[in-house]
C-alpha cells in the first residue's frame, strides 16, 4: 500500500480539471502536474519513491499527474479497449492504481521483444493516436494494425490492478495496460526526468 489514506487522494482527484493529450500519445484525460496543483502531495510521492532507491538525494524532478480513462468499448476485451505496448523516455516511471474494486485484467503487463528488436511504424502510430484522441477508426483496420504491432512482443509478467498499489519500472521496460475495463480507471502515472545521484538505481 502506497498511501496511508488512499480514499483522501481519490477525493483530491475529483476537485481538479482534466485535459486530453494534444497529440494522442496517451489515452483518456490527465490533470495538471501535481507540483502545480498539489505541491505537498507531489513532495510526499516523490520523496517516498526516490527513497526506495537512495538513502540521501539532494534533488530530483518528476512529472506526475492524475489520469482518468473511460472504456473505449462495452466489450472489455475489445482491442480498442486494450493498451499499446511501449516504453517511456525517462529515467524510470510507473503508476499508482487508485480505482476501487477494479475489474480483472486492468493492471499492467510487462513484455519483451520476441526477436530482440521492435518498432512502431507511422501507420500504427497514426491509428493509435487517432484512437486515443477519440477519432473514428474502422474496427477491422484497427485490429489489423494492433495485431501486427503486438505480434512483436511476448508477455513476461502480469501485474494486477490492486487499489493503492505502486508499480515501478525502468525506462526500457516494455509494458502496457491490459484493458481499460468497464468503468473509469483512475491512476497516478509518474516519470522521473532527473535525479542528482550519479548512478541510477539499477547500478547502485
Whereabouts are the PLM-identified features?
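Catalytic core of non-heme Fe(II) oxygenases with the double-stranded beta-helix
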Residues: 74-204
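Non-heme Fe(II)/2-oxoglutarate
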Residues: 1-83, 107, 114, 122-133
Amino acid at each position: 500500500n502506497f498511501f496511508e489514506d488512499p480514499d483522501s487522494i481519490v477525493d483530491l482527484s475529483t476537485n481538479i480539471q482534466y485535459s486530453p493529450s494534444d497529440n494522442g500519445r496517451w489515452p483518456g484525460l490527465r490533470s495538471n502536474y501535481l507540483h502545480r496543483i498539489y505541491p505537498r502531495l507531489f513532495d510526499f510521492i516523490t520523496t517516498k519513491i526516490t527513497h526506495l532507491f537512495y538513502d540521501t538525494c539532494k534533488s530530483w524532478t518528476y512529472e506526475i499527474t492524475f489520469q482518468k480513462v473511460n472504456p473505449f468499448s462495452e466489450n472489455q476485451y475489445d482491442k480498442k479497449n486494450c493498451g499499446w505496448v511501449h516504453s517511456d523516455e525517462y529515467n524510470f516511471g510507473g503508476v499508482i492504481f487508485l480505482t476501487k474494486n477494479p475489474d480483472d485484467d486492468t493492471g499492467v503487463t510487462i513484455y519483451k521483444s520476441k526477436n530482440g528488436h521492435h518498432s512502431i511504424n507511422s501507420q500504427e502510430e497514426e491509428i493509435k493516436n487517432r484512437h486515443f484522441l477519440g477519432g473514428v477508426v474502422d474496427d477491422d483496420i484497427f485490429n489489423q494494425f494492433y495485431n501486427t504491432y503486438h505480434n512483436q512482443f511476448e508477455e513476461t509478467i502480469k501485474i494486477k490492478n490492486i487499489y493503492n498499489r505502486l508499480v515501478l519500472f525502468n525506462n526500457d521496460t516494455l509494458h502496457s495496460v491490459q484493458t481499460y475495463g468497464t468503468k473509469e480507471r483512475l491512476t497516478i502515472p509518474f516519470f522521473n526526468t532527473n535525479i542528482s545521484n550519479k548512478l541510477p538505481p539499477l547500478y547502485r
